[in-house]
């Protein structure tokens, strides 16, 4: 496999999330310390579609942001050459400028694009957006932090 991509097995080694909360299916490209482009394939089998909404399934906006935060985590871990362990945790610490532009529905492929803006002392700032068919679905500035817990 290309060093600049990740399949689901590599993602599972880098993220603690598991079904139904793992929201990154593949990394298409990663430019160390700069940016990542990843995919979330949205299917009708997603558990959140049972109640959001039964008559017209739409991916909750907070889960689009979570998918972006998970892609950001992959970028952060790659930037600092680390694999998370049981003694550390990666927090989604904040978001600014969030704008939802279009609904995401079953069958859509959510392309996650995250750019690392700044990192200092375990705090990471990102500019993030997600697209469907080259159309902006959501954009935000994300703040995340890596902390030792042991």
UniProtKB/Swiss-Prot annotation:
Organism of provenance: Albidiferax ferrireducens (strain ATCC BAA-621 / DSM 15236 / T118) (Rhodoferax ferrireducens)
Protein keywords: Cytoplasm, Lipid A biosynthesis, Lipid biosynthesis, Lipid metabolism, Lyase
Gene behind this protein: fabZ
Catalytic activity: a (3R)-hydroxyacyl-[ACP] = a (2E)-enoyl-[ACP] + H2O
The name this protein goes by in its record: 3-hydroxyacyl-[acyl-carrier-protein] dehydratase FabZ
Active site: 52
The keyword Lyase appears for this protein: yes
Keyword Phosphoprotein appears in the UniProt entry: no
SUPFAM superfamilies to which the protein is assigned, alphabetical: Thioesterase/thiol ester dehydrase-isomerase
